Amino acid sequence: MAFVLILVLSFYELVSGQWQVTGPGKFVQALVGEDAVFSCSLFPETSAEAMEVRFFRNQFHAVVHLYRDGEDWESKQMPQYRGRTEFVKDSIAGGRVSLRLKNITPSDIGLYGCWFSSQIYDEEATWELRVAALGSLPLISIVGYVDGGIQLLCLSSGWFPQPTAKWKGPQGQDLSSDSRANADGYSLYDVEISIIVQENAGSILCSIHLAEQSHEVESKVLIGETFFQPSPWRLASILLGLLCGALCGVVMGMIIVFFKSKGKIQAELDWRRKHGQAELRDARKHAVEVTLDPETAHPKLCVSDLKTVTHRKAPQEVPHSEKRFTRKSVVASQGFQAGKHYWEVDVGQNVGWYVGVCRDDVDRGKNNVTLSPNNGYWVLRLTTEHLYFTFNPHFISLPPSTPPTRVGVFLDYEGGTISFFNTNDQSLIYTLLTCQFEGLLRPYIQHAMYDEEKGTPIFICPVSWG
């Protein structure tokens, strides 16, 4: 019976030349920063080696990837997909192919399809790509006393699409609260939710729920009876009594502690300074020459003497180049795929800058992309609020400190680390560990903020040994 069925199908194929295209299903689910795989096949099995195979988005002419005449036609792709697709054709003789779409972002959401065309017949299948991002664990903080109660604030970042945030009481009941969600420049949502509770409220939960992934994360805080609500009169009387009784003891204690701890604290500071200096001295042994590539610079960035980048108010007229960034970025002419390398960048009093390395094959035509290791970036940023942050691979906020005017960057390719130094006080800002470097890496600078009054050039500077 099976043999007869095979003969019938073979005869049908030879006579009609028709077949059906089967896609990956009604929808494909993918997480931001990861890859999505679209698998398509022909039924009955038919070789697609001599066919045109087109993956498209929303409409037929919006090409995600094109296979024709036995070759991949990258020139036909939409710019946002160049360098991000991998056409897998190991089983194309049996009519089975796959397309891997790399580094998924929220902007990739939409309707996709695969289309097979022979000389006498064509057919397609479509599906929906759904994208999600799982954000950080909720962070609960106690703001203080408000309107006779205790105000709690819960924060979580990096979600897509917008999640549901709510407070829950000790029995799991939903509590009335105020919430806000704001999308950042990468379409990821930051959630903020607040509530006012009474003393002895017990266990209070902050819950963030993403329905699309059936994913929920919670954090808990226990509100007991020990919270002390300050009354001005009661607080004043208590402070007066304590002040009179303890003033002498405090003064004497401070004197004793001062002399005991002065030497210890100074010794610890000296050790930290020497330790940081030792790391920096070792890094500077691997100093390399770095020059900027003008062909990669955004039109608003002017590169001079191959070392200096200045943010202009108006874009320059520059020749078209596939190497040029659509973000206000520039990379070096030099690239590294082995060894240890150190260079220094003078950022002056600027804010909103990024300094670090990126893979040579990152999508330079895409503006809204998270500069994280998942997307081929290992960078440090200083925001307008003088707050450092980086990704490894998720968002890391670093403790505020005096912003440097010069940043040292130390790349250890085989060691899988990149360190950032404040060369002003010779301290280590942060080290990204367990980095999985692949391919060629280039020194990277993003000069994101334009300030006509305070803005100054950013430049690669000679390594200082002081």
Curated annotation (Swiss-Prot):
The keyword Membrane applies. Residues 18-237 are extracellular. GO terms for molecular function: signaling receptor binding. Residues 259-466 are cytoplasmic. The keyword Signal applies. It holds the Pfam family V-set. Residues 270-463 form the B30.2/SPRY domain. Its main location: membrane. SMART domains: IG (SM00409), IGv (SM00406), PRY (SM00589), SPRY (SM00449). InterPro entries: B30.2/SPRY, B30.2/SPRY_sf, BTN3A2-like_Ig-C, Butyrophylin_SPRY, ConA-like_dom_sf, Ig-like_dom, Ig-like_dom_sf, Ig-like_fold. Residues 1-17 form the signal peptide. It is a single-pass type I membrane protein. It comes from the Eukaryota. One of its GO terms (cellular component) is external side of plasma membrane. It is found in: Membrane. Expressed in small intestine, colon, testis, spleen, and leukocyte. Keywords: Immunoglobulin domain, Membrane, Signal, Transmembrane, Transmembrane helix. GO terms for biological process: regulation of cytokine production; T cell receptor signaling pathway. The chain crosses the membrane at residues 238-258. Residues 138-218 form the Ig-like V-type domain. Belongs to the immunoglobulin superfamily. BTN/MOG family. This is Butyrophilin-like protein 3. It comes from Homo sapiens (Human). The gene is BTNL3.
